[in-house]
Amino acid sequence: HFPDTWATQWFGVGKMIHSLFLINCSGDIFLEKHWKSVVSQSVCDYFFEAQEKAADVENVPPVISTPHHYLISIYRDKLFFVSVIQTEVPPLFVIEFLHRVADTFQDYFGECSEAAIKDNVVIVYELLEEMLDNGFPLATESNILKELIKPPTILRSVVNSITGSSNVGD
């Protein structure tokens, strides 16, 4: 039994996020995560076209329709979080989820920046894996995630780099 949250409402809708791309202000895709099947980075070309047409980064449309996908994005801390959806989904659910991802990175790493994400890439992928199960939002609450995946510490980072272990809780 799942708690009655916005995320579980999605299970009834039967929709999912296929991929997530993190893009910096220079237009570089520096992280991508795929859940169902790999979606080519070329899908982001539609996003880049919309970005070029926008007066500034704040004016990039949050929902972009392409021939085969919908791109739903947010702009936070000089980063674009671009999700790829294959079927119609209430955009606010996806936007709320993307904000929760950014909030989680902020909570775990002290900032939601390209450098922090790259420095903690293993934890980032572990978090995304826990937050979405086959593209469906699952564990999005920080206190639950911290039970599953231990936040980084300097000591843990050194130990993990020496032993090759991860931050997944026991």
Region annotations inferred by a language model:
Residues H1-D4:
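Intrinsic-disorder-associated, low-complexity terminal segments enriched in Asp/Asn/His/Tyr and depleted
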Residues W6, W10-D170:
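Acidic, low-complexity cytosolic segments
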